[in-house]
Amino acid sequence: MKRLPRLSPVTRVFVVAILGTSLVHAQSLSFVTCPIVRDTKTVPCWLAEYNGEIYYLGNQGGVAQDFYPPQLNHEVLVEGTIAEGPRVCGGAPLRPVKTSVFLEINRACNTILPVEDGIEAPARAPARDPVSWVRSDGPSDTTLYFDFDNDFLSLHTTTAVQRIVEQFQQTKASAIEVQAFRGSSRLSNGTELLEQAGIAEKRVAKIREILEGLGVPKASVRAIAVTDVRRANGVDDPWSRKVTLSVKK
């Protein structure tokens, strides 16, 4: 076997520094915290603090954007990846990022930072696919993603359900198969959060109600709540909280 050349001490330090930087930028983070609002001259930014670092989550915006902002007076589960590039609105950017608002009231979550010269909100990014909420494999198969411990449907997920119904009606299909899943999330500190028992049933019941309300016959909705929970890994946990819809001929 051919041996690799021995690196000098200086070269080793340089390589370690480069690899260390790459690992930091690729690091996945998952933590629960109070969200922070940073006021700017244009629109507010949402930030979060973890282990002494401030992270940029996104701008306050409309329901059509992929990022749904947290709420003051509520803790939030932040799941994201540290992105390369300069700080944004005073924080290291997380992209992609998924935020899940916890329903319990916490009055301590009320920090609003004032406008500061040199700290600006980024311009609104061009509209893109709502990857935090919906992924489609063709017109007949769609996966909807959910906030932790929630059956809330965003504008994106509601629109996706409507399109599935249109596909069902246009193709004169026989059924729509619905499977709902309960997820879990591994925090960066090692704690594992498990969604409440029954959340998959709540999600499948809500989707069934919407489908039937849009004209799909009750007998044509084949709905299952999956009881098994995928083990969290701290990387792609947001995608374990889902409902799949498939139009069947």
What are these regions (language model features)?
Residues 1-9:
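N-terminal secretory signal peptides that target proteins for export/translocation
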Residues 11-22:
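Bacterial N-terminal signal peptides
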Residues 27-42:
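Structural detector for short beta-strands of small beta-barrel domains
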Residues 38-41, 81-95:
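Single-stranded nucleic-acid-binding OB-fold domains
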Residues 38-59:
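OB-fold (S1/OB) nucleic-acid-binding surfaces
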Residues 63-79:
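Short nucleic-acid-contacting surface segments enriched for D/E, G, S/T with interspersed K/R
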Residues 87-175, 189, 233-239, 243, ...:
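Periplasmic peptidoglycan-binding/tethering modules of Gram-negative envelope proteins
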Residues 182-249:
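Periplasmic OmpA-like peptidoglycan-binding domain that tethers envelope proteins to the cell wall
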